[in-house]
């Protein structure tokens, strides 16, 4: 089996930066738990897709062996900085660059000092303990012009490239659920999902994921994305579906809660 584990985790930095806030701390603990499950699956590489690595020209793959620095989130800068030191599997990333045009997608590698690693990738790496020598990454960008279908195709080709290199793969989709944020300042201890309808939609979709009902999930996703203004149309879930060839038996929701009004969940998929 090439894919040995799969996870969906939030891209918000709030659980990492302010774990003392109860609801955010629960998400941080859940993400750390997901990281332990990932490590237990013994992958050779982790395929990561973050909705916050935005691209408009080509599909980008991170081909720099080591990326390090300090990142300041453009929205949550008042809560602190995000230091990172991330290792990449360059052989597999280069294979993804080469394979992408064969699937109708223009692609290029990104390898230069100071490239701005996004918040979601950094947070996932920090809390899950990935992007290390033991668990190097292959990171694909979120091209704003790519549909969910293309995103699935990219994840599938990355898995195929890993199979060609005889590598065990963990898959991580980084992003949120419902997208309504509070526009006014709130007490973080009183954070909640912004409205009841968003919460209902989140819980409905999480139940479908838990049940492994992929057919019903695919039917619900476009409506959910529109009605609840889901983070980037739920392309991070499309990434997971593509890597899993559209099949999984169920999932465990390790955590669900608010991130300044928006929805966030930590999910471990059963393969």
Curated annotation (Swiss-Prot):
GO biological process: catabolic process
Any one GO molecular function term: ferrous iron binding
InterPro entries tied to this protein: Xdiol_dOase_suB
UniProt keywords, alphabetically: Aromatic hydrocarbons catabolism, Plasmid
CDD domains: 2A5CPDO_A (cd07373)
Protein family (similarity comment): Belongs to the LigB/MhpB extradiol dioxygenase family.
Note: Not active on 4-methylcatechol, 4-chlorocatechol, 2,4-dihydroxybenzoate, o-nitrophenol, p-nitrophenol or 4-nitrocatechol.
Full protein name: 2-aminophenol 1,6-dioxygenase subunit alpha
């Amino acid at each position: 089996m090439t894919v040995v584990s799969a996870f969906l985790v939030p891209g918000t930095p709030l659980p990492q930066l302010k774990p003392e806030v109860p609801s955010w701390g629960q998400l941080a603990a859940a993400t750390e738990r997901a990281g332990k499950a990932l490590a237990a699956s013994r992958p050779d590489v982790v395929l990561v897709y973050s909705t916050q690595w935005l691209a408009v020209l080509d599909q980008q793959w991170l081909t720099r062996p080591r990326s390090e620095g300090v990142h300041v989130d453009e929205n949550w800068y008042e809560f602190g900085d995000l230091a990172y030191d991330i290792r990449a599997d360059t052989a597999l990333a280069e294979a993804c660059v080469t394979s992408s045009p064969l699937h109708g997608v223009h692609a290029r590698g990104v390898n230069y000092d100071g490239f701005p690693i996004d918040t979601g990738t950094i947070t996932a790496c920090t809390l899950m303990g990935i992007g290390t020598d033991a668990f190097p990454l292959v990171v694909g960008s979120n091209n704003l012009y790519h549909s969910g279908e293309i995103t699935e195709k990219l994840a599938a080709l990355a898995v195929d490239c890993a199979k060609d290199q005889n590598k065990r793969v963990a898959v991580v989709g980084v992003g949120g659920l419902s997208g309504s944020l509070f526009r006014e300042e709130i007490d973080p201890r009183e954070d909640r999902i912004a409205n009841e309808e968003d919460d209902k939609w989140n819980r409905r979709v999480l139940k479908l994921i838990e049940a492994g009902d992929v057919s019903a999930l695919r039917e619900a996703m476009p409506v959910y994305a529109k009605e609840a203004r889901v983070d980037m149309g739920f392309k991070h879930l499309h990434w997971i579906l593509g890597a899993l060839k559209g099949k999984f038996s169920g999932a465990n929701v390790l955590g669900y809660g608010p991130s300044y009004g928006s929805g966030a969940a930590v999910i471990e998929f059963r393969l």
